[in-house]
Amino acid sequence: MGLFGRKKTTVGLDIGSGLVKVAVVDHSKSTPELVKVAITPLPDDAIVEGEVMDPHVVSDVIRATIEAVDANTKAVVAAVGGRDVIIKRIKTERVKEQQARELMRWEAEQHVPDVDSVELDFQILEENGSASRDEMSVLLVAAKRDLVEAKLRILSEAGITPMSMDVDAFALHNAFEVNYPSAMSGAVGLVNIGH
């Protein structure tokens, strides 16, 4: 535990179709440092086309991969992705942040089929000088509730508590931005080929 209770390490977990990957990042220095990595293959039929076919096997592999890095925490950062996640950038009337949640639910109903079966989140985006005083740009994210709940069950069975659940594309972007901040001023293309 760091000063004032801030943790010095973060454990990141990526569950791919063929591999479970765990990374331990130390935040005690001026820049984050990758200190441990473990990669464990999954059986061929454990995850097929992004759908978990055998949750018990997947949770066992996750548990073993976490143990391989000897992480002294069971709190991890995980992500969801694939065709069951919808990301939309929308323009809407400018409102105060506390009113935004209700407005985003209404906006989601316009963009997401069966809004009652998804988990919603949003981020109000900062505009560089071109923003209208009456409008705001918002990134709206919807993930199928079944997908999120299935991921949480697998993590729970593995004895893991997610500190946060991100979208895999955002996690890739954030990792790039932290490691290559100067590249963010130009055009950048990131490709997640996966395995």
Name the predicted role of every residue range.
Residues 188-195:
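Acidic, glycine-rich loop-and-beta core segments that form the ion-binding/anion-interacting portion
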